[in-house]
Amino acid sequence: MSIYAKNPIMPGFYPDPSICAVGDDYYLINSTFAYFPGLSLMHSKDLVHWEQIGNVMDRNSQLPLMKAGHSQGLFAPTIRYHEGVFYVICTNVSHGGNYIVTATNPEGPWSEPYYLEGADGIDPSLF
């Protein structure tokens, strides 16, 4: 079976994408900077047709953006799946630094962020 895809596959604003496969499903997350709700989560069965299934950071308690400027907020998230749990690691450059959130269902609910003390820098990844 062959599938033809146009470029870009996802027109619009989806910077710094990260993707993971779980069985026949693909999940893609991207930077959302100072926008709320944060971290758009997309789903696809074929890597061509994508549908937004939610936002990882969708509660005010998860995402303090009061002091975030236009070029701040959430940078370059990474999504992974291991033994029944989805993990997202990301940087909130406006508040707290690097953090991890988890969920057993990609549509949520996602946990409150666990900030990683001493893990300075931006654009973290999990392996």
Model-based region annotation:
Residues 1-127:
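Carbohydrate-active catalytic/glycan-binding domains of CAZyme proteins
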